[in-house]
Amino acid sequence: SEAVAEKEDDPNFFKMVEGFFDKGAAIVENKLVEDLKTRGSPEVEGNLTFT
């Protein structure tokens, strides 16, 4: 049962998931920013703040 507990907390798995999440979030973020630029009216765009 100790071997099972070690596999559940495998830091390599968490690093791998975190890496995939970061890459996916960067792709989605760029797409969302582009969509906001093309769809927003000038009034709305003036109120948006990107950090």
UniProtKB/Swiss-Prot annotation:
It comes from the Eukaryota. Gene3D superfamilies: 1.10.287.140. It is found in: Mitochondrion matrix. One of its GO terms (cellular component) is mitochondrial matrix. This is Glutamate dehydrogenase. It comes from Electrophorus electricus (Electric eel). Substrate binds at residue 31. Mitochondrial glutamate dehydrogenase that converts L-glutamate into alpha-ketoglutarate. Plays a key role in glutamine anaplerosis by producing alpha-ketoglutarate, an important intermediate in the tricarboxylic acid cycle. It is an enzyme of class 1 (oxidoreductase). Disulfide bonds: none annotated. Its main location: mitochondrion. Belongs to the Glu/Leu/Phe/Val dehydrogenases family. Homohexamer. Its EC number is 1.4.1.3. The keyword Oxidoreductase applies. Keywords: Mitochondrion, NADP, Oxidoreductase. GO terms for molecular function: glutamate dehydrogenase (NAD+) activity; glutamate dehydrogenase (NADP+) activity; glutamate dehydrogenase [NAD(P)+] activity.
